[in-house]
């Protein structure tokens, strides 16, 4: 795992096409913006797991 320190307004590049920008910090919450091509899915972890669960349920039926 890569661990980085970023300040508000700073950006992290993932590959050539995905950027993650720190938009704000308030208490223990960090607001981030993700810019990625349409073919790249971007989800919060809990949503991603829900999607995977629903896909597995559909394949069982």
Curated annotation (Swiss-Prot):
It is found in: Cytoplasm. Pfam families: CsrA (PF02599). One of its GO terms (biological process) is positive regulation of translational initiation. GO terms for molecular function: mRNA 5'-UTR binding. Keywords: Activator, Cytoplasm, Repressor, RNA-binding, Translation regulation. GO terms for cellular component: cytosol. Homodimer; the beta-strands of each monomer intercalate to form a hydrophobic core, while the alpha-helices form wings that extend away from the core. A key translational regulator that binds mRNA to regulate translation initiation and/or mRNA stability. Mediates global changes in gene expression, shifting from rapid growth to stress survival by linking envelope stress, the stringent response and the catabolite repression systems. Usually binds in the 5'-UTR; binding at or near the Shine-Dalgarno sequence prevents ribosome-binding, repressing translation, binding elsewhere in the 5'-UTR can activate translation and/or stabilize the mRNA. Its function is antagonized by small RNA(s). Belongs to the CsrA/RsmA family. This is Translational regulator CsrA.
């Amino acid at each position: 795992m890569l661990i980085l320190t970023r300040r508000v307004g700073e950006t992290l590049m993932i590959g050539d096409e995905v950027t993650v920008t720190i938009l704000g910090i308030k208490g223990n919450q960090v607001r981030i913006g993700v810019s990625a091509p349409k073919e790249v899915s971007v989800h919060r972890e809990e949503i991603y797991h829900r999607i995977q669960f629903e896909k597995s349920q559909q394949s069982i039926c």
